[in-house]
Amino acid sequence: MIVPSACNEANKGDIAKVVLMPGDPLRAKYVAENYLENPVCFNTVRNMFGYTGTYKGKRISIMGSGMGVPSIGLYSYELYNFFDVDSIIRIGSAGGIDDSIKLRDVVIAMGASTNSGFANQYTFPGTFAPMASYTLLKHAADAAEKIGAHAVVGSIFTADQFYDANSESAAKYREMGILAVEMETAGLYLTAAKAGKQALSILTISDLVFTGEGLTASERQDGFTQMMEIALETAWKSLD
C-alpha cells in the first residue's frame, strides 16, 4: 500500500512496529549495518535513511529524525499515524546539567520540559507534561542494569535553540532538577501521546554544560555503544 508521505518512500509493512531513532541519518545507517541482521533500506528521501532488519530474531527498524522538535515531530507523526508503528525509541546525545551527571552517563528521559511551542497545536487547556512510556522506560532501566551501564532515570529539557542567548537558562533548568538538555524528546513524547503510542529517549552525555568538558570522537563512540545495547534490548523486549 502506498502511503501519502513526501518525506518517507516506504510502503505499509516495510517498517517494524518498533523504531529506533537517532538524530543523524548516518548513525541510522551505521546501526543498521553493524547491529541488525539482513537490514533493508526503506527510505532515502532527503537522505533521512531508514532500515528494517532483525535483532535476536525480532523485526526492528531504525530511521534518522534530523535535528530539533519540528523534524522529529514530522517523522514520528508519520511513523505512528501512516506506518502503524507502536513504539519509537530516540537514541542521541545530550549536555549534562545536574552536578551528579558525568560524561558517558546514559540518561533515560522520564519526562521532557521544553520551551518549544509544539504543543500549542493541541489547544490543551493547561500545560501538558510530555512523558515517556513507563513500559519502555522500565525495559530500558532493566537493560542498563543487566549490562552494568551507569544509567540515570529523570527529567530532561528539550530546547528550541542550540545557541541560547539567555545565559541563565541552564542554571534555571538545574534548579528544577533537570538532568540534561537536548533538542528533540519533548516533540517525540507529545506526538506519541496524541497518537496513543509509546515513546522513550535514551541519551548519552557527550558534554557538560557548566564545565565545558566533552568527549572525543572515539569516546563518543564508546558511550554510543552502551546506549545502543540498551536501546536494542528495550526494543526487543517491547515486542514480547
Task: List each language-model region with its residue ranges.
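Metabolite-binding pocket within alpha/beta catalytic cores that recognizes anionic/polar moieties
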Residues: 1-130, 134-136
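Flexible, glycine/charged-enriched surface loops at secondary-structure junctions
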Residues: 37-44, 148-154, 239-240
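Zn-dependent metallopeptidase/amidohydrolase metal-coordination segment
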Residues: 186-220
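His/Asp/Glu-rich mid-to-C-terminal helical/loop segments that flank catalytic regions of hydrolases
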Residues: 209-240
